[in-house]
């Protein structure tokens, strides 16, 4: 089974053995809705939204651990939706399937492929192995709405940019 964007989510669930009723229940769940809305679950807010308390009146922080050639200025937000909660939902949803197939999507209940877009090389990426959650996350990361994801040093966005109907994969 193949899919792009939302089709990657549905296709991956089917490939993992979910029934249509199971999929509907999952997609209507509050956890899943919270994931794509960008709202951080209350129990995680402390870890992601709170600053570490310090005795300083104010502070300025610099980090030189990355060389200047890798410097990427962040003047504008890269997405409308904060991806933290979505990433947590996807880890919970896809971790067992990734572990059981050992990263080979041919070993899922139904062999699976999804399409993502290589931002810099302007071509489709056929995701056939690796972390299933990352592959699906890349395939459904609609530009400006969701932050792109880096997989194997490739920045990946929504697969619908180059192949919205992947019947040729």
Task: Locate each region found by the language model.
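Patatin-like phospholipase
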Residues: 1-4, 13-169
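Acidic, glycine-enriched active-site microenvironments
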Residues: 10
């Amino acid at each position: 089974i193949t899919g792009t964007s939302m089709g990657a989510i549905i296709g991956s669930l089917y490939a993992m053995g979910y029934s249509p009723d199971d999929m509907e229940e999952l997609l209507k769940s509050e956890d899943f809705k919270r994931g794509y809305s960008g709202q951080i679950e209350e129990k995680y807010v402390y870890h992601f939204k709170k600053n570490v308390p310090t005795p300083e009146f104010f502070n300025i922080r610099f980090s030189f651990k990355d060389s200047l050639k890798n410097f990427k200025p962040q003047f504008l937000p890269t997405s409308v939706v904060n991806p933290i909660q979505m990433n947590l939902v996807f880890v919970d949803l896809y971790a067992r399937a990734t572990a059981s197939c050992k990263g080979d999507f041919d070993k899922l209940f139904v062999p699976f492929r999804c399409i993502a877009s290589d931002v810099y090389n302007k071509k489709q990426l056929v995701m056939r192995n690796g972390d299933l959650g990352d592959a699906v996350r890349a395939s459904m990361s609609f530009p400006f709405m969701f932050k792109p994801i880096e997989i194997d040093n490739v920045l990946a966005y929504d697969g619908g940019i180059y192949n919205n109907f992947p019947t040729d994969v």
